[in-house]
Amino acid sequence: MDTISTFARRVGLTPSALRFYDDCGVLRPAHVDPDSGYRYYSADQERDAALLRALRQAEVPLADITAVLAGDPASAREVLTAHARRLRSRADTAHAAVEAALRMVEQPSHGEVS
């Protein structure tokens, strides 16, 4: 078992992030010392921590991450496919807005002398 600091370094998360994920019920430590309250993580949790980090980078909501980590591969795929669809939609909307702004910038202003 690793201390929270050792585990955090190994998986690329901060100890405060691991505490937050524990408090939210997303990634619980393998063991919490009843006297000190220290959290300990097992090597078996590295995959879930790495997946959690990747999903947060993809802006997946915590509720969806919890479902992915707790669910079977088919339901995880469903959750992630839905998230990818939402991301594509937001990207399309943002792209259209930038294109419209570019067209406005490229048009001469009213009253401008050319």
Question: What are these model-predicted stretches?
Answer:
Residues 40, 113-114:
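Solvent-exposed, well-ordered amphipathic alpha-helical segments
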Residues 69-113:
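Short, charged amphipathic alpha-helical surface segments
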